[in-house]
Amino acid sequence: SAKEMNALQPGTRSFAQFDMDSFANVTNDNDNPYLADMTKKAIELLNSNENGFFLMVEAAHIDKFSHKNILEGSTAQVIEFNKAIQVAYDFASRDGDTLVLVTADHETGGITYNEETGEYYYTTKSHTGVNVPVYVSASDAGFITGEAYDNYCISTQLARVMGYDKSQFPKTK
């Protein structure tokens, strides 16, 4: 619950499970926290680590609504995700040593705009091959504006920024 989450103290280990279907309801008429609330609390808890931290925040309901072609739902979830991004960005701006990276693993639904009717519509209920953007809050993170990246390169670049050498990565086939 939001109450239990807010009671957590830095240094406390926590594994949280929330009623995931309730995240689809952005009016939040239950006791689950919003994604932005969870992001803020996670940063608060993780920031006490003197070695820094890595936090991944996912907004899975954007994809779930897009698979069902529910524009209002996916749009509402993008707005909620944007609030969580703003929490992270505000922290990074104050901290001065934090990078915020926002991306997606794929696009779903093929949302398209019809100029004649002024309406948006979906072209599929599946994932598309459309490139997804990568937004980075720091210019020295090694990403080049306008450049396309294979998604596996993002983790390599992030690891480099965090001080890890590629030779430390496990070998894959």
Please identify what each model-predicted range represents.
Residues 1-173:
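A post-motif C-terminal structural segment
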